[in-house]
Structure formats: C-alpha cells, structure tokens
Amino acid sequence: MPAPLFLSGPCEICGQKTSGRHFGVMSCRSCAAFFRRAATCSRIFGRCPNGNCKLLENGKFKCKKCRMKRCLEVGMDETKFQCNRDLISSSNKFQKRVSLIEPPPQSLSTFLGRPTLLLCCEPTRASHIKTLINVTYMVDVARDILKRDVSTKIPYQFHNSLERLALSLEEIRSREPDEKIKMLRKIGQEESLLIWEQAFLRAVEWFSNFSEFNALDELSKMTILKSAWISWTRLEKLAETADHQRKKIFGDSVMMCGNDACLDLANYEVDLTWCTNYTTEQLLFYLSPEIEQNHFLSLQELVELNPTSTELSYMLLQITLHLAGKKAQGQLLEITEMLLEAQGNHLHEYYVKKLKMPNYVMRLAKLMKINRRIESDMRDRVEKNHIARIFNILKVEFSEPDMFEST
C-alpha cells in the first residue's frame, strides 16, 4: 500500500495552516484564491515602498504586491489553472462558453436518416415494385350479404336492435363447436388471407342484422365496414378467447384467430416471405403489437368481467362506429354518433329493466377501458403501416387499401 500523501503543514506563502497543494505549491485556500484572482486580472499593483513587507500582520494582508511576489517565488504556476469548472458562472461567460460547445452527437437514427424502427433493415431489401392482391371479391360478397332479407332469420323475440345483434352474435358463434377448433402452427400467405376473409365476412354478417345500419345508403355502409371490420375482429376474437379460457378450453397463451382456428402465441411460426423481403427478426418491432402487454391485459379483464352478449354487442358497436366516424368525419360522423346514442339508450334500458342494475357506471367504464386500449393499439398499427409504406417494407398492396391500413 503506498504511503499517504503529505497534505499538512504551513502555507509556503503566509505560514498559515495549508489545505493542500494549489498550483504546484503547498498553500492555504486564501493564498490560492488570491493568486488565481491576481494572475488572471489585468490590474497592476502599485509600487511597494518597503519591497519586503510582512505578509500577515494582525490577521490581515496589507501588501498585495509583496504577496504576489511571494507566490511567484515559491513556485505558483498560472498554467495550472483549470477553467470552465465553476458551478456558478456569470451569464455572459456562460453564454460564451455554451456558444463554443459543439452540439450533442447525432443519434444513430438521425445520422442514418432512418427511424429506430428500421435501423436493422437493409435498404437493398426495400420493395419498389408491388404485387397486387385483389380483394374485390370480398367487397362483392359483402354487398350480396347486405342485400339479403334477414327479417325472419332469427326466430327469437327481441325488443330492440341491440338485443337482435346480441342474438345474432350468439348464433354466429354457435356454428363452430369447441371440439372442432384446430390449432395453427404456422401463419403464412394462405392462412393470413383466409383469416382476413373470414373475419371481414363475419363482421359483415353481424352488421347485416343491425336494422338502423341497413337503413343507410350503400356507400355509407361499405365505408363503415371497410374501416370497422379489423377493430370488430380484434374485440370479438378477444372476447371469444376469454370465453374459452374461462371454460378451461384454452391456455393462457392461446387465442382465436379464425372462425374455427386458434393460435398458441408461445409456439408458432411466421412466414413473411410472401409480403416482404425483410426477415422476421428485422421486423420484430413492427410485428409486436399483436402480442404485447395490452393484448393480454384486455384478455384478462374480459375473463374477469365476463360481458354478456348484449354488453359485448354494444362494445363492438362503440369501437367500430367510433373509429369509422372519426376516420371519415363529415356526415358519416354525424350518422355514427346518432347510431351510438340510440344504442346507448338501449343499453341503459337493458341494465335497468332486464339486469335490475341501475348503478352500472363502474362496470360500463371498465368495458369501455378495454375498447380504448384496443383503439390505442389500432392507432399504433396505422402509424407503423404508414412507415412501412414510406420505406417500401412490404412488397404487396391491396386493391382496397383502406381495408387493410391497420392489419
């Protein structure tokens, strides 16, 4: 162990107790501060009549000229000054110093001119030539479904359109028995397109039982469906998955992803070669919203709340009509707000008269919280798809692009 440094003893200038080595000399803080001030200022001390004054007399230093001379004689060195280390500086010096400091280094994303999302992506893999996927047939089938007469389709008694939608949802779900659900191990082009087709047509069929919706013109109906089917599917599949988990049919990581198919999020393979030249690892951040925390949190809340078919039908209407109206604005926004107001009255009647639950505000707030979480994920997906289009991440495009902007 090295010997400790000797930092005690008298000041070599005035003889007082030293506080350490300052500017190359063992000195007290007073003499060190004096030398720093005197050596940096432009003031010239007057001539000393004695030439060799006693530095410290009655606790005071009378002659600055002799004190400065003594500092230089014992070896104080002004080249050892350390500048720009003061915690408190005058505003002028501070501004001058800041102006000389270089700006902070650029982040990697700023330097490369690419967002953090795409730092690991190779520009040579960008797809400037797109493959068109024609989904016009889905829109044509949707128009045919909406033209059908569904007035006698449901033989049960209902009092309003919300109850009719609840019965329709139960009837649609009853077509796929639990024992016929198959587990998917791989998601590729064929599986993706089939799942999207099933989801879109399922949403169309459900909306076809909405009497107020059927009264709208065809353009308004198709605009709502194109904007709403993905959010409708997200919520409906979450609710269906929660129902299966409640019955102990599914594990915690399994979810419905089609009319008769499910997917284990902890054990499946994704094939993206049909839609992009980038690898799954490069697009991991882009693909994450489907499996992130919001998804499982919403699923857990649906398991605990166990919404009825009527409550779920209102949730489906709220999230779809709200997003469709917000996107389209104008007259369609007024239409969706009018439809939601009417269904809100039906839901109030359902709580008060059928469930005998006049204080339902807290429960409804929890259900709407799930909707807001899904809406947040949808906005995130739209933004990332926009980035993907700008940087040509995907090598496919759809004949109805507004239908798939949040997939």
From Swiss-Prot:
| Keywords on record | DNA-binding, Metal-binding, Nucleus, Receptor, Transcription, Transcription regulation, Zinc, Zinc-finger
Cellular compartments annotated: Nucleus
Note the InterPro entries from the entry.
C.elegans_Orphan_NR, HNF4-like_DBD, NHR-like_dom_sf, Nucl_hrmn_rcpt_lig-bd, Znf_hrmn_rcpt, Znf_NHR/GATA
Q: Which GO terms describe its cellular component?
A: nucleus
Primary location recorded for the protein, binned into one broad class: nucleus
Checking PROSITE patterns in the record gives:
NR_LBD, NUCLEAR_REC_DBD_1, NUCLEAR_REC_DBD_2
Record domain NR LBD: where = 157-407
Q: Where are the zinc fingers (NR C4-type)?
A: 11-31, 47-66
An example Pfam family from this entry, by short name, is: zf-C4
Q: What molecular functions are annotated in GO for this chain?
A: DNA-binding transcription factor activity; RNA polymerase II cis-regulatory region sequence-specific DNA binding; zinc ion binding
What family is reported? Belongs to the nuclear hormone receptor family.
Q: What does this protein do?
A: Orphan nuclear receptor.
Descriptive protein name: Nuclear hormone receptor family member nhr-134
The scientific name of the source species is Caenorhabditis elegans
